[in-house]
């Protein structure tokens, strides 16, 4: 019986071989991920090819540092060690490092994070803010020693001198760069004197630009209440920060141009044009009003002011005739009633009653005539008042009071500014006309 090994003895022997074999301590393996189901801590799945399958284990610390998400069917390259699990007698590979086969891990991580953030709405156009036409102060999150800040300062100074630039010195690559970029974006948003923010750096490899692909940077840009222009790398480089920013510029110079869409020269030209338009509009209005005044001066009302009250005279005559007619009609009615009552009373031989009715009738007649007379006097007084007001506008009456109408070239003169020394004037007085020549013009300053 001593020639037979127990299962546990054989398994222990094989495990010892596995653990001591240098070829199994560091194995480079290519396979396709199978039976993958994400777990909170350690990850357990299989690697397979067309002919075989091996179990794989990835501890939580390795998985968190992976940089991309494992997916079912993904082909990956792994480095690890092979070990034997004694209770089941099965072997597996303990993965210490992994990356996608064919493309880099950063590229996969980029696409996976891009998809995640896009689904969360971080890149939606509805969240984009409009850039202001005119800015007073621009914040810049970039390295203080790079060419980016120099290009921005040069371009802004050329396009719109007087715009202030506030630099937030920032580490733009390497460990801690992403956190510093995000912190400075939030710091800029705490200020109230900035109009917009430029976030960027110069060109480099995907590793150099990676800070601008980190989720914390994208989130800081998305949450910014300041409009943000991204300028990361060269024109061919695209980062997740570019997708989240309100505008993307290919170069720092282009970013500065976007930040100052209207140059100082453009603004001065615009103001000059508006000034000219305003002047022309005012002059047109003056000419229109002047033409209206001249048209009024040539109207019949000013040449024949008596026409202003002709209609009132006619209306008064009509009212007088109408009133007299009404008085006669009322009087005739009462006279007829009186005659009828007298006849009726006489037929009854009621002399006392007749006398009372006669007295009442005479009183009613007096009241009626008094009321009618009062109405007539009131309307006549209103007419005479209106007539006097209109007659006061009659130029012949004005002249009759000792005034004169002064004309030059058949136009009435209203101001000393309309005449000058040597002008010949025509004066119309109540008893004749006079031709005079101006020897001196004195203008009153307070008029």
From Swiss-Prot:
Q: What Gene Ontology molecular function terms does this protein carry?
A: exodeoxyribonuclease VII activity; nucleic acid binding
Q: Which Pfam families match?
A: Exonuc_VII_L, tRNA_anti_2
Q: Which InterPro entries match?
A: Exonuc_VII_L, Exonuc_VII_lsu_C, OB-fold_nuc-bd_dom
Q: Where is this protein chiefly located?
A: cytoplasm
Ordered alphabetically, the record's keywords are: Cytoplasm, Exonuclease, Hydrolase, Nuclease
Name one process (GO BP) from the record.
DNA catabolic process
Q: Report whether Hydrolase shows up as a keyword of the record.
A: yes
Supply one GO CC term from the record: exodeoxyribonuclease VII complex
Give a yes or no for keyword Hydrolase in this entry: yes
The chemistry this enzyme catalyses reads: Exonucleolytic cleavage in either 5'- to 3'- or 3'- to 5'-direction to yield nucleoside 5'-phosphates
Question: What are the coiled-coil residue ranges?
Answer: none
Which EC numbers does the record give?
Answer: 3.1.11.6
Q: Where in the cell is it found?
A: Cytoplasm
CDD domains documented for this protein: ExoVII_LU_OBF
Say which enzyme class the record assigns: hydrolase
- Role according to the record: Bidirectionally degrades single-stranded DNA into large acid-insoluble oligonucleotides, which are then degraded further into small acid-soluble oligonucleotides.
Summarize the subunit comment: Heterooligomer composed of large and small subunits.
Assigned protein family: Belongs to the XseA family.
- Descriptive protein name: Exodeoxyribonuclease 7 large subunit
């Amino acid at each position: 019986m001593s020639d037979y090994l127990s299962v546990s003895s054989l398994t222990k022997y094989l495990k010892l071989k596995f653990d001591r074999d240098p070829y199994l301590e560091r194995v480079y393996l290519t396979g396709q991920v199978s039976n993958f189901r994400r777990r909170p801590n350690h990850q357990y799945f299989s690697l397979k090819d067309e002919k075989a399958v091996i179990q794989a284990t990835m501890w939580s610390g390795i998985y968190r540092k992976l940089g991309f998400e494992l997916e079912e069917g993904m082909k990956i390259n792994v480095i690890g060690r092979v070990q034997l699990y004694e209770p089941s007698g099965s072997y597996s590979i303990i993965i210490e490092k992994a990356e996608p086969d064919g493309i880099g891990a950063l590229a996969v991580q980029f696409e996976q994070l891009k998809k995640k953030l896009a689904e969360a709405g971080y890149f939606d156009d509805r969240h984009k803010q409009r850039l202001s036409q005119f800015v007073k102060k621009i914040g810049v999150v970039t390295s203080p020693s790079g060419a980016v800040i120099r290009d921005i300062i040069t371009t802004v100074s050329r396009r719109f001198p007087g715009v202030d630039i506030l630099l937030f010195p920032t580490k733009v690559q390497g460990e801690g760069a992403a956190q510093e970029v995000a912190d400075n974006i939030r710091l800029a948003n705490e200020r109230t004197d900035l109009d917009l923010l430029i976030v960027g750096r110069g060109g480099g490899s995907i590793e150099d630009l990676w800070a601008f692909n980190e989720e914390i940077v994208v989130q800081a840009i998305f949450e910014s209440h300041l409009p943000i222009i991204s300028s990361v790398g060269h024109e061919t480089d695209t980062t997740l920060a570019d997708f989240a920013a309100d505008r993307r510029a290919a170069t720092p110079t282009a970013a500065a141009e976007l930040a100052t869409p209207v140059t100082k020269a453009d603004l001065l030209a615009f103001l000059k044009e508006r000034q000219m338009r305003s002047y022309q509009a005012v002059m047109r209005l003056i000419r229109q009003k002047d033409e209206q005044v001249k048209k009024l001066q040539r109207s019949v009302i000013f040449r024949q002011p008596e026409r202003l009250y002709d209609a009132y005279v006619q209306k008064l005559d009509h009212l007088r005739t109408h009133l007299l007619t009404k008085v006669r009609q009322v009087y005739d009615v009462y006279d007829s009633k009186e005659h009828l009552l007298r006849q009726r009373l006489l037929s009854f031989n009621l002399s006392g009653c007749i006398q009372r009715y006669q007295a009442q009738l005479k009183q009613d007649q007096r009241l009626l005539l008094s009321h009618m007379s009062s109405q007539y006097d009131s309307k006549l007084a209103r007419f005479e008042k209106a007539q006097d007001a209109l007659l006061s506008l009659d130029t012949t009456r004005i002249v009759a009071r000792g005034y004169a109408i002064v004309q030059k070239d058949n136009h009435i003169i209203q101001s000393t500014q309309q005449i000058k020394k040597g002008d010949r004037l025509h004066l119309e007085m109540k008893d004749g006309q006079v031709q005079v020549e101006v020897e001196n013009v004195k203008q009153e300053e307070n008029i």
